[in-house]
């Protein structure tokens, strides 16, 4: 099983992960071809350059703790499902 598959299974597993890190999120999204762009301060935007019709996924990178909050995990899951990255 590849790293992307393990991260995807973990993200979409039940119950949702409470310790999914920012670096794991970036790694998973890069596996789908989604790039990260830094904004002001801790703001980050994720976009797919091969699919301009897909809107940006806007996120706030937490600090100093880089663990995603529950609502962030749900937002990522909804984004990936809505735009066909995950079935």
Where are these regions (language model features)?
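Short, well-ordered coil↔helix boundary/capping segments
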Residues: 19, 40, 66-70
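Polyanion-binding surface elements
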Residues: 15-33
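Long, intrinsically disordered, low-complexity Ser/Thr/Pro-rich regulatory/activation regions
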Residues: 54-87
